[in-house]
Amino acid sequence: MDFLVLFLFYLASVLMGLVLICVCSKTHSLKGLARGGAQIFSCIIPECLQRAVHGLLHYLFHTRNHTFIVLHLVLQGMVYTEYTWEVFGYCQELELSLHYLLLPYLLLGVNLFFFTLTCGTNPGIITKANELLFLHVYEFDEVMFPKNVRCSTCDLRKPARSKHCSVCNWCVHRFDHHCVWVNNCIGAWNIRYFLIYVLTLTASAATVAIVSTTFLVHLVVMSDLYQETYIDDLGHLHVMDTVFLIQYLFLTFPRIVFMLGFVVVLSFLLGGYLLFVLYLAATNQTTNEWYRGDWAWCQRCPLVAWPPSAEPQVHRNIHSHGLRSNLQEIFLPAFPCHERKKQE
């Protein structure tokens, strides 16, 4: 089987797996299928191996550690090393614009700056000292966030839109999610840095992909490779087609083509996620609220069995006040007074 077919099959499998993970997180029937599949595999895989895998997954995803930060920096370093070592030099020989070639480095610098801010900024940790102040920031909707609820772990009253992070073991104001790639919670005070981090990471991956593609296209055009012919295994003469051309480029520039495939897939994945977080920002939702929206009781859902004495409770977004106000809330978050004094 041709290399290109195998490579495309691999990419399709990865993308399909990610799509299924996203869909399963919101679809209860698919969750049941996933649990059933896990039970089947548990009967096949030895128990000692199951414990080892479970322990590893628990460490990676349910404890604070720097594994994914290191992986993030290693992957980013490998991409930019290859870009600098080969693509940048070849593009200079082709006399491409220097500003065009330096753009990925500019995006890298901005990305690392906001990556550091996202990792190190307090996301909005709720303590006994600021508990009362946070209780007055957002209105309780009495559906997803009822009043007078205490956190069973922190023993603090839970402000609206807050959540206890089981990984970090603290409650976070306007909790969005825990991101393993930055080893920190994403909350009210660092969501702005996280948005710019994702934006610049997407832009840097896309820019590296565009520059690398430009180099390969220039090479094909200048060498007239698309006009060449080749002889197949049966001795038949063929004009150079796209599949054969890509395989030829892979054999000639394997590291560049492999890096290009990686950053192209990464650009699509990050681009899709960026659109999602921008949608949440524009509608003043958090990832936690978006996910829990399916669990909130809704009179529009005919499959929900209501208790006889219960009034239908409709979850609606009471925090969205227009695009401008929503974005202002993210990029200019409210700080409790005593927290401002500490920072000053």
From Swiss-Prot:
Changing P104S: In a breast cancer sample; somatic mutation. GO terms for biological process: positive regulation of innate immune response; protein localization to plasma membrane; protein targeting to membrane. Pfam families: DHHC. Residues 149-199 form the DHHC domain. The active site is at C179. It catalyses: L-cysteinyl-[protein] + hexadecanoyl-CoA = S-hexadecanoyl-L-cysteinyl-[protein] + CoA. It is a multi-pass membrane protein. Its EC number is 2.3.1.225. InterPro entries: Palmitoyltrfase_DHHC, PFA4/ZDH16/20/ERF2-like. It is an enzyme of class 2 (transferase). Residues 24-67, 121-192, 277-344 are cytoplasmic. It is found in: Endoplasmic reticulum membrane; Golgi apparatus membrane; Cell membrane. A motif (Di-lysine motif) lies at residues 341-344. Interacts with CPT1A. Belongs to the DHHC palmitoyltransferase family. This is Palmitoyltransferase ZDHHC4. It comes from Homo sapiens (Human). The gene is ZDHHC4.
